[in-house]
Amino acid sequence: VDVVFETEKKVTVEEVNAALKEGADGHVLCYTEEPLVSSDYIGTSQSSTVDALLTRVMGGNQVKIISWYDNEMGYSTRLAETTLMVAEKL
């Protein structure tokens, strides 16, 4: 996933990554500072893993974030969790 957005205030790569790291729960969203490639994420159950080494800030307020995922496994895992949640409500 390649996300680019503008912030209201100036930020640094370190600030962006700190916020992403804090927000990553390790279950749905992960965060890594390891130099991995797309094939390293095959079979991961997380919906997305933020690649902190690829975070960029341009002009102080334009931020680019890259995250990786295994579409089949991540989706299947979320679907199974949703099914269990619905079943518990019945």
Language-model segments: residues:
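C-terminal substrate-binding/catalytic lobe of Rossmann-fold NAD(P)-dependent oxidoreductases
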Residues: 1-63
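NAD(P)-dependent Rossmann-like dehydrogenase/reductase catalytic/cofactor-binding core
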Residues: 45-90
